[in-house]
From Swiss-Prot:
Pfam families: NELF-A_N. Disruption phenotype: Loss of zygotic expression results in morphologically normal embryos that hatch as 1st instar larvae. These larvae survive for several days but do not increase in size. Loss of maternal expression causes arrest prior to the cellular blastoderm stage and embryos display abnormal nuclear morphology. Those that escape this early arrest proceed through the blastoderm stage and gastrulate normally, but then almost always arrest during germband retraction with head defects and incomplete dorsal closure. Component of the NELF complex. Interacts with Clamp. This is Negative elongation factor A. The gene is Nelf-A. Residues 309-318 have a biased composition (Polar residues). GO terms for molecular function: RNA binding. The lineage of its organism: Eukaryota, Metazoa, Ecdysozoa, Arthropoda, Hexapoda. Residues 89-254 form the HDAg domain.
Length: 1251
């Protein structure tokens, strides 16, 4: 009932306020508002159109003050919901009117909306001008309207005469008619005064007269009664006066008629109504009499017939009894009742932007073959008989979009059905002016192109699920499939959308609107158990992260969506884009090479930049299991059959907090260059893997040729068509044609690549290789990189403008994900270098827009802090004139034993440095740990000569801005994935291709290069409140604020040089090569991102690039191998606990969180029934829904259970009796997975006390 009421309210609002001819509104709807209507408006407010929302809010200004006081709570709730709206005008207007119900004045102080503050200030100034302009008119006191002219003049004074601007030459016709009517009325009045006064009593004049009454009530009798009471014989008693005053029976023109109260004459309408009621009563009496007579006659006839003919048929008897033959319901067997219940359960909660189209599209997809009812009778709880002409009759709707809809099944079957359904789960539960966020994922069993319309769904009546769905995956045959399941509140109208406002259909790309989907794995990551045979265990690789990193179309604005389908092997290279993100290959070793190419050519994937579907890596426990697998298979299949990390899915609620989570290694692949395979085999693994790596050489060359064939749309190869290893290489877009692979490979020898690694260990050991594949035609240093993609939006490599052909740019959306972009060594200045920059308008500086409004104040202050001219800043020259350079600072910190040339020492305590800042007054120095908490300043010129830089790691605390922590030998920062239930989204860092000193947005050539030094870039969160003022940063630290995230410090340091207890070290051959090439640098990037107290993950990447552009010797750069030593997890626990304690003690950091409309609805429903939840608990629940992953009440399980309400209910018992139970409703917030669920506890009440 509530849904119907909400839909009626929203429909009424759209009818009243939806017209576009007037942009503002008067108080026309205020008379129809009440508390109940305002509550309904609050429920359906997010689904209204933008102009309706604005007009509704403005109409509140017309509500009388008495009603505003009475409806204060409801008005404030509506304004609060409006303040969370995604439309800036609506939220800003709601912020302006926030104080209106309480104070009857507007809110002129806005602090939260940074980017709309200038507009708001302009609006307030305009309002002030209008008020001052009209304030001199002077409002008179209220009592002045009761004064006459002389008294008003005495109170107010003589008013100035109104200015006469023009004179009419001829009076209009209306004025002439008016004067004539005035004359006539005056004449009539004068003639009335001349007439004599009537002799009727005054009380009888106003007596109502019955229209049908013929008694003359004319007032003056024709003969004046001059003889008193006409008879002197009648005594003049007062009691008999009424009788005497009656008119005689024979006289018709008497003056007065006296009646009783019961005979009081009625008006014409009332008399007519009474007459009609009397007629109806008479007719009912007549019908009852007829029925009684007919019943008596029928009974008599029936008894007579029964006595005379006992064998007469019952039909004859019925015919004789009343002539009415009973109709048996046989028609129900061949006609099916059309019900629309499952599809319209939540129809009213959907978007009302186009309610007719939404409903029609929902009906059009329920179509089924009505001629074959035998298979549909088991699941006929949804409408199947609506014809396709409903969709076709609407002009402009593409018929391509009509897809298959599965019947509504029970929840157990629905989870299995969702691989069939996941490309059709459309939901209109969004704000209308925003294009819906979209995900389309198809599994390999269901290959349904968008242009095929399925007419018939074959369901099995016993299981109630579609017969073409895939079977539940078994453990050995198929690895865990990814099931996309929409949340239960959104399971309405699953069908293709034919909404005209949002659907765009092109030849190659068919957009299909999708809702955000919760991703649930059918089999958790522990499903890949060590007991499975090594031949069938496969490493699941999802190309989704790679698509986010390299898809040139995935990062469009939120209102544009592009469907991308994968290239069909080598044939459809021109239409190549990214392959399906969540398809899973059931790889049997025998049929692997045959099956993989056709499987991956079909499933398209449609994803918006703001709808993440991330596959996160499993924790260290899973990796340990994978390491323990026996490597008994042959060397050709070892890499694939031992998965290094099982892949788990992230629920949507955690994906929404992408910017608040730490990094996660998504996928890793060993990709080795062709030249160094033998040398690497000796370094990284046992000698048995060398044969395998030689096989990988040829495979990778073939793979690279196939990739370069598809570089025009920047494709990624779905999976290498060999069984042993899974590799993805994303190439920078090129402008060459793509027909000839070999020539292109030779023409483009220095192709910078974005490489994602699916890391696999051939042997159970802790060494992992990260290498990029470069074409064999060049002799340069290969790029070694670990690519990480952000969960919130995708990063794409696209060519820059035509004026700058030497640059490729990474286009970042409004919520910019960082990206590790590396290229091969730059041979010439005209060669392609990878730079990272923001999409922006020309002639405007780079601005990073926060995704949520709450983070904007932080964001602005962080920007001011970046642009403040500190003396330590190094401004790097910009290559694009229209962009403002980011200021970056460099601080190299080799934390080692006492070395050469100590200049001075600082004593920095990690606890005392909580709210302090190390300010280096000298520009050319670095800090070096000399033991304990002592640090030593060393000039940068001495860094290149320091050889004892090994054996050191660097830790940062989350307690203060840049406090330095001393390192113990056991506290090495590891490449770790801790605590099995915690999945955190990755964070990426921009680095330049050359090992310069600057971490900048754009850089052609580094301005100053420190010779023979490796660098380490450390990004750490700043947990102090930035709003308290601008913090002075030490030299070498750059504060970076990303939208929706806490500020981070970027720090570039000298990296350790030896292999002793280091995070990332280079091998001995690489060290020797580094000494031979004094200009060659190595960049090492360490990301420390600890947004939550108990969730810590660190991500280590390394890149090696030879500075060949500066050497002038293109063959001098030797390939290098970088080994990552994964140490024991237990060493990190003390440090992690220490950081957790420090973080929990500090002031809370304000986060940029935002709630979707769906979550707002859920929270309203939850809190409306809750009677035991406090305001802090409500805030905690809302923060969790909005994506906050810091548990404010830490416990061992990192799970909170909050009591929402308790009621008393009578519950049916098993024995048939009802018992009074206390029903407690709780909500369970799992900070590990980001999921929440509500449940109820039933407690039996004491029956005696209850009675």
């Amino acid at each position: 009932m509530a849904n119907v009421r909400d839909s009626d309210t929203s429909l009424w609002l759209h009818n009243k306020l939806g017209t576009s001819n007037d942009s503002w509104i008067n108080g026309s709807i205020c008379s129809q508002l009440n508390k109940e209507v305002l509550r309904n408006i609050k429920e359906c407010f997010p689904d209204l159109q933008t102009q309706v929302k604005l007009k509704l809010l403005l109409s509140f200004l017309h509500i009388p003050r008495r009603l505003v006081e009475e409806w204060k709570a409801e008005l404030e709730e509506v304004i609060e919901v409006a303040g969370l709206d995604s439309e800036l005008w609506v939220s800003m207007l709601a912020e302006t009117m926030k104080t209106f119900p309480a104070t009857s004045s507007l809110n002129t102080e806005i602090s939260d909306y940074e980017d709309t503050r200038p507009i708001f200030i302009d609006m307030v100034n305009d309002l002030r001008k209008l008020v001052t302009k009209h304030s001199d008119l002077g409002m008179l006191p209220l009592e002045c309207q009761y004064l006459n002219k002389n008294a008003l003049i005495s109170v107010v004074g003589q008013q100035p005469a109104p200015v006469k601007h023009f004179t009419l030459k001829r009076k209009p016709k209306s004025a002439q008619l008016r004067t004539e009517l005035l004359h006539k009325s005056a004449d009539a009045q004068s003639s009335l005064k001349k007439a004599s006064a009537p002799t009727i009593p005054l009380r009888s004049r106003g007596m109502p007269r019955k229209m049908t009454d013929t008694t003359p009530l004319k007032g003056i009798p024709s003969r004046m009664p001059t003889t008193g009471f006409r008879s002197a014989t009648v005594p003049g008693n007062a009691a008999q006066r009424p009788n005497l005053s009656r008119t005689p029976a024979g006289r018709k023109d008497g003056g007065i008629k006296l009646i009783e109260f019961t005979e009081q004459p009625l008006g014409y309408a009332a008399a007519k109504k009474r007459k009609r009621e009397q007629q109806l009563e008479e007719q009912q009496k007549k019908q009852e009499q007829k029925q009684q007579q007919a019943a008596a006659a029928a009974a008599a006839a029936a008894t007579a017939a029964a006595s005379n003919a006992g064998d007469s048929s019952p039909t004859d008897a019925a015919t004789a009894s009343g002539g009415e033959t009973p109709v048996t319901p046989t028609s129900a067997n061949n006609s099916f009742e059309i019900k629309m219940e499952p599809q319209q359960l939540n129809q009213s909660a959907g978007s009302l932007e186009e309610p007719q189209d939404d409903e029609m599209s929902g009906k059009a997809n329920m179509e089924c073959d009505i001629e074959t009812p035998e298979y549909a009778t088991a699941t006929l709880d949804f409408a199947q008989a609506t014809s396709t002409s409903v969709a076709d009759g609407q002009p402009g709707k593409p018929a391509v979009e009509t897809k298959l809809k599965t019947p509504r099944t029970p929840k157990s079957a629905a989870k299995l059905n969702n691989n069939n359904n996941n490309n059709n789960n459309n939901s209109f539960n969004h704000t209308p002016k925003r294009i819906k966020q979209e995900i389309e994922i198809k599994s390999e069993e269901i290959i349904v192109p968008a242009s095929i319309k399925l007419e018939k769904i074959e369901t099995s009546p016993s299981t109630q699920r579609v017969s073409i769905q895939q079977q539940p995956p078994s453990l050995v045959q198929r690895t865990p499939h990814l099931l996309i399941r929409s949340s239960p509140q959104k399971r309405q109208n699953n069908g293709a959308t034919t909404s005209a406002g949002t659907t765009t259909t092109t030849v190659g790309n068919t957009t299909i609107k999708m809702e955000k989907l919760d991703i649930k794995p059918m089999i958790r990551a522990t499903g890949v158990s060590p007991s499975t045979s090594a031949g069938t265990t496969t490493t699941l690789l999802t190309p989704q992260q790679l698509r986010q990193a390299a898809n040139p179309l995935a990062n469009l604005p939120n209102n544009i969506s592009v469907k991308i389908t994968s290239a069909k092997a080598k044939a459809a290279a021109a239409a190549a884009a990214t392959s399906s993100g969540s398809q899973t290959q059931s790889q049997q070793p025998q049929t692997l090479q045959v099956q993989q190419a056709p499987q991956q050519s079909h499933p398209p994937l449609l994803i918006n930049s703001s709808t993440p579907v991330i596959l996160a890596s499993s924790p260290s426990a899973q990796r340990a299991k994978a390491l323990a697998l026996p490597s008994s298979s042959t060397s050709a299949t070892t890499t694939t059959t031992i998965p290094s990390q099982a892949i788990k899915t992230m629920p949507l609620s955690q994906l929404k907090t992408a910017t608040n989570s730490g990094p996660v290694i998504i996928s890793q692949t060993i990709i080795q260059p062709a030249k160094r395979a033998q040398q690497q085999a000796g370094t990284s693994s046992a000698a048995a893997a060398s044969q395998q790596q030689q096989q990988q050489q040829s495979q990778q060359q073939l793979l690279h040729q196939q990739i370069q064939q598809q570089t025009q749309q920047q494709a990624q190869l779905p999976q290498q068509p060999q069984q042993q290893q899974t590799q993805y290489i994303l190439a920078t877009p090129q402008q060459q044609p793509q027909q000839i692979q070999q020539q292109q490979q030779q023409q483009q020898p220095i192709l910078p690549t974005l490489t994602s690694f699916s890391h696999s260990r051939p042997m159970p050991q802790t060494t992992t290789l990260y290498q990029a594949t470069t074409p064999s035609g060049s002799g340069q240093t290969p790029t070694k990189i670990l690519l990480k993609t952000s969960g919130s939006s995708s990063v794409v490599m696209t060519p820059l403008r035509q004026a700058q052909p030497q640059q490729a740019t990474a286009v970042v959306s409004s919520n910019p994900p960082p990206l590790v972009a590396t290229s091969a060594a730059v041979v010439s200045p005209g060669q392609t270098t990878l730079n990272i920059q923001n999409v922006q308008l020309p002639n405007r500086p780079v601005t990073i827009q926060p995704a949520s409004q709450a983070a904007q104040q932080q964001h602005m202050q962080a920007q001011l802090q970046q642009q403040q001219p500190h003396p330590q800043h190094t401004i790097v020259a910009n290559t694009t004139a229209t962009q403002q350079p980011k200021l970056s600072q460099v601080l190299m910190q080799p934390t080692a034993a006492v070395g050469t040339s100590g200049v001075s020492a600082l004593n920095v305590s990690p606890t005392s440095g909580k709210n302090k800042t190390i300010i280096l007054t000298q520009k050319g120095v670095i800090l070096r740990n000399i033991g304990g908490d002592m640090y030593q300043q060393i000039p940068i010129s001495n860094v290149g000569n320091m050889q004892g830089l090994g054996g050191t790691t660097l830790m940062t605390t989350t307690a203060g801005p840049p406090s330095l922590v001393k390192t113990t030998p056991s506290s090495g920062v590891q490449l770790q994935q801790q605590q099995s239930g915690k999945q955190i989204l990755p964070t990426l860092i921009p680095t330049s291709s050359l090992g310069g000193q600057h971490v900048i947005v754009q850089q052609q050539q580094p301005t100053n290069v420190i010779g023979n030094s490796q660098q380490q870039t450390i990004i750490r969160p700043v947990m102090t409140n930035v709003g308290g003022g601008l913090t002075t940063l030490p030299q070498g630290l750059t504060l970076i604020q990303r939208p929706g995230q806490q500020p981070q410090l970027v720090q570039v340091q000298a990296a350790p040089g030896s292999t002793q207890r280091t995070i990332i070290t280079q091998s001995n051959t690489a060290a020797a090569a580094s000494q031979q090439q004094p200009r060659q640098q190595q960049q090492q990037i360490l990301v420390q991102h600890k947004p939550a107290p108990t969730l810590q993950q660190r991500l280590v990447t390394s890149t090696t690039s030879g500075g060949q552009g500066q050497q002038g010797n293109p063959n001098a750069g030797l390939p290098r191998t970088v080994q990552v030593q994964v140490q024991a997890q237990q060493q990190q626990q003390p440090q992690q606990q220490q950081a957790t304690q420090q973080q929990s003690q500090q002031a809370p950091q304000r986060r940029g969180l935002s709630l979707s409309n769906e979550h707002v609805h859920k929270a309203h429903e939850m809190f409306r029934k809750a009677n035991r939840v406090s305001r802090p608990d409500k805030a905690l629940i809302l923060g969790f829904m909005a994506g906050l992953r810091e548990n404010p009440r830490p416990n061992n399980e990192n799970v909170l259970v909050i009591k929402l309400g308790e009621t008393e209910e009578k519950v049916q018992q098993d024995n048939g009796h009802t018992a009074l139970c206390l029903v407690e409703s709780h909500i369970r917030l799992d900070y590990n997975t980001g999921e929440w669920k509500t449940f109820q506890n039933y407690r039996l009440q004491d029956q005696s006390a209850a009675s």
